[in-house]
From Swiss-Prot:
Function: NDH-1 shuttles electrons from NADH, via FMN and iron-sulfur (Fe-S) centers, to quinones in the respiratory chain. The immediate electron acceptor for the enzyme in this species is believed to be ubiquinone. Couples the redox reaction to proton translocation (for every two electrons transferred, four hydrogen ions are translocated across the cytoplasmic membrane), and thus conserves the redox energy in a proton gradient. This subunit may bind ubiquinone.
Keywords from the named record: Cell inner membrane, Cell membrane, Membrane, NAD, Quinone, Translocase, Transmembrane, Transmembrane helix, Ubiquinone
Entry protein name: NADH-quinone oxidoreductase subunit H
Lipid bilayer topology: Multi-pass membrane protein
Subunit structure as annotated in this protein's UniProt entry: NDH-1 is composed of 14 different subunits. Subunits NuoA, H, J, K, L, M, N constitute the membrane sector of the complex.
GO biological process assignments: aerobic respiration
GO CC list: plasma membrane
Catalytic activity: a quinone + NADH + 5 H(+)(in) = a quinol + NAD(+) + 4 H(+)(out)
Signal peptide: none
Lineage: Bacteria, Pseudomonadati, Pseudomonadota, Gammaproteobacteria, Chromatiales
Length: 337
């Protein structure tokens, strides 16, 4: 029993430690990429080419005081960051990095992911309410409405993946996409793929859907009263969720660890030496780059535009395509057999 527990803890930390490092350096990459897009250098002073900047930022936040507003609900104010970060980390337990390389290979993996992504908003709601600030409360109201709206669209998009793969096990979904890149789910499920990606960006409160923070409108939204490591935990949760949505997109629609040349006569054997985890990381890196690209490119949606997009475009679009997809699957049409 103790060996089993030790092995489980080892697997958990084998995922969490690289994840924390990835989040830290994702912030560095974001500042460098957006800097180049805006024709400036970005961080380049701390360490060679600024590579130690994330460590400097972490130390700065570590030594800052966590100030609690006078009229805030102290207990809830301190609990909220933990409630935001825990679902963001727990969701990684079912992500398969390669064949058999997963912390918990459960059959209800897709349902588990939906549950974890839904729970994260409670941290935002409690943070805004406990701060006793009108700006934080406005950010909380926006965040809750946004997550409810886009969680439905994302859930319907993932139902399409379930219909196509015939399983909720994430490893099983990846196995169902075995073959070259045109046999992955991105092509037959293209409308659902696009809706999933738009909903994923909205769920993580990133530009152009960052109305919950809205610096130009409500100062900084739900975490306006937070400082020090309490603020850093919210920051960590946001970037962990961004990476999670990117890895999920690669897993559910782009074949996971499968090579894009798998099964091809010449290119297939030529790329057989590349480990599956490298392909997965490369696909996820593309989606992570898109987050940065969107932030540097698109203006923020107005609140009414965001709600209209979710309720009048994405949700009806997923319902229509699910009806079409069900007919195709039952009719034996498509690459699902």
């Amino acid at each position: 029993m103790y060996e089993t527990l030790f092995w489980q803890f080892a697997k958990i930390w084998a995922v969490l430690i690289p994840l924390f490092l990835a989040v830290a350096y994702f912030t560095y990459v974001e500042r460098r990429v957006i800097g180049h897009m805006q024709d400036r250098r970005g961080p380049n002073r701390v360490g060679p080419r600024g590579l130690l900047q994330p460590i400097a930022d972490a130390l700065k936040l570590l030594f800052k005081e966590i100030t609690i507003p006078t009229y805030a609900s102290r207990t809830l104010f301190l609990i909220a960051p933990a409630m935001a970060i825990m679902p963001a980390l727990a969701a990684w337990a079912v992500i398969p990095f390669d064949d058999g390389l997963v912390v918990a290979d459960i059959n209800a993996g897709l349902l588990y992911i939906l549950a974890m992504t839904s729970l994260g908003v409670y941290g935002l709601i409690i943070a805004g309410w406990a701060s006793n600030s009108k700006y934080a409360l406005l950010g909380t109201l926006r965040a809750s409405a946004q997550v409810v709206s886009y969680e439905i669209a994302m859930g319907f998009a993932l139902v399409g993946v379930l219909i196509a793969a015939g399983t909720m096990n994430l490893s099983g979904i990846v196995h169902a996409q075995a073959g070259p890149f045109w046999e992955w789910f991105w092509l037959p499920l293209l409308p659902l793929f696009l809706i999933y990606w738009i909903s994923g960006v909205a769920e993580t409160n990133r530009a152009p859907f960052d109305i919950a923070e809205g610096e130009s409108e409500i100062v900084a939204g739900f975490h306006v009263e937070y400082s020090g490591m309490a603020f850093a935990v919210f920051f960590l949760a946001e970037y962990a969720n961004m990476l999670l949505i990117s890895f999920l997109a690669a897993t559910l629609f782009l074949g996971g660890w499968h090579s894009p040349f798998e099964g091809l006569p010449v290119l297939g054997p030529a790329f057989d030496w590349v480990p599956g985890i490298v392909w997965l990381f490369a696909k996820a890196a593309f989606f992570a780059f898109c987050y940065l690209w969107f932030r540097a490119t698109f203006p923020r949606y107005r609140y009414d535009q965001l709600m209209r997009l979710g309720w009048k475009v994405l949700i009806p679009g997923t319902v229509v395509w699910l009806v079409v997809l069900t007919g195709l699957v039952y009719g034996g049409v498509g690459p699902w057999f």
